[in-house]
Amino acid sequence: MKKIVSGVLFSLFVLPVFALYNSFGVPDSSEIRKELVESWFEAPLQNVRMNRPEIRTNSVGQKFQIRMEETEDSFNIFVAPYARIEVDVYSDKGKTTEVQDIYPGDAPGSWLLVRDKKSGKPLRIRYYFAADSEVFVQFLPSGKTALCDYLIFGCYAAKGVPTGLPFGRFYSSSFDQVVRWTENSLPWQYMQIHPDDYHAVQQMANVLKERNPDVILVDDAMYDDEGKPVYISSGKPRKNGELEEGKISVSGAGYLKWIADGIIEPLAGARLKRDPLLEPTVEYKKTGFQGILSEKYAISFSLDWVRNLASGVISVRTGRNYLYKDSGVDVTIEPFCAELTEKGIRNSFGYIENSGYSVKMLKPLLYVLAAQNPQLFYFGAIRETDRRSPEVKIFNECCAFFPYFDSQKRFKCEVFKDGSQMSFEEFFSRYCIDSVLLVKLHAAEEFYPAD
């Protein structure tokens, strides 16, 4: 009988077979690495090539594989922890699922040394500690000491931080030691994640998934504070031909209002009024291009809409009437100093007033926001660039982001737009050259969007 093992790992669920060795639950290879310095970390490339992959066990029974992988310019030495992964196996009898032993080079507890291929000199040491492999710390030699970086999905939360320690110290240092030595210089608060804290965020996202089949997209459509179908642009009643019994007919902006109303109606017995949502929140210079454009077009529609929606929700929750300028709803944090691009490292632009953040920074930004504020979700106003006239930038569309960490502490983000759910990857692909301004809202356990 022939078996075909799928070339793709269909299930990326790594089984938790590690014993907990330190306070962070990260498998620790430090005692093993002490014995590898001469034969793996400092030996010439030709000698390292002669080393066969090794399996070693630490004092608490955790297994690690030591191996070398070559690239065009460097050779990488991995000390990788044991894990098990489910794969689908196809044969003439059908499909079965098998559990296979692996040693992933980027799983929590993995340690990586990168060396230059020509000189053999060390370039960096990387510690993987998060469920998301694109979140890690790395150390780089600088003279007699080492500098440290903390990266989150290609963005530097810290870069070039002096450690005052010789680079060679990290050949045998445990992750616990790394955290202690850098506790005041690296943002370790981003790894203090408690999955149970995201219940309200996940519950709201699940409700929207259940209700989305009832939503149909209609241009310029919303429900007013009395639940009557009206036009956003005029406030006048909509025509019967645009309504469908048993369906929620809204535009993209009306969809976000429907979400906001689902939070406040259980609290106040009412919905948000239309007129305050259209109040301008930004003034453009009349002599500038955007100012001239704003005289003719509503170039800040979705920007004003999401800001005023969030301000309205805060007003109902607190019992105080907040105008946008006093509400503090905008997300303006600057957690990154640089980003890793195809052309190398460049300084991060971060937040731009009344424009928001580049969509390219959105995933690491939402990761940080979720780690810091597990009770929040976000409305986003999308500032699009006209493909034919790049100087024209308009806030016309909007969406909702629900970031959280799952039970395995892996980062997830549910995106809802125009009455439908979309993957973050799809959102990124569609709007990667644009920017998004985020406003924050508290997730509600009692969330009941209207029928």
Spans of features found by a protein language model:
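Cleavable N-terminal signal peptides
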Residues: 7, 17-18
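Cysteine-nucleophile amide-bond enzymes
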Residues: 19-451
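Sec-dependent signal peptide recognition
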Residues: 2-10
